């Protein structure tokens, strides 16, 4: 089961989530329109195990990274059985 990893605009590019991930799902890359020292992450969700360590490591009050487990996303779309 793959999980959905969403990085929000409140990300400050500190890389705490990248370092916390045990499966190297997150990678910091430059993005179009980025300002000095701002970076975005490129999640490889097929390797995500859903441990949510990236969420715990996020220092922003806005929780800039979220992991949605497969059953959370299917429930929100009305696809659960």
UniProtKB/Swiss-Prot annotation:
This is Photosystem I iron-sulfur center. Residues 2-31, 39-68 form the 4Fe-4S ferredoxin-type domain. GO terms for cellular component: chloroplast thylakoid membrane; photosystem I. [4Fe-4S] cluster 2 binds at residues 21, 48, 51, 54. It comes from Dioscorea elephantipes. [4Fe-4S] cluster 1 binds at residues 11, 14, 17, 58. InterPro entries: 4Fe4S_Fe-S-bd (IPR017896), 4Fe4S_Fe_S_CS (IPR017900), PSI_iron-sulfur_center (IPR050157), PSI_PsaC (IPR017491). The gene is psaC. The keyword 4Fe-4S applies.
């Amino acid at each position: 089961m793959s999980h959905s990893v969403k990085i929000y605009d409140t990300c400050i590019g500190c890389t705490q989530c990248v370092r916390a991930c045990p499966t190297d799902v997150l990678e910091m890359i430059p993005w179009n329109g980025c300002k000095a020292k701002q970076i975005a992450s490129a999640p490889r969700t097929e390797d995500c195990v859903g441990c949510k360590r990236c969420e715990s490591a996020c220092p922003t009050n806005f929780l800039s990274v979220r992991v949605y487990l497969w059953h959370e996303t299917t429930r929100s779309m009305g696809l659960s059985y």
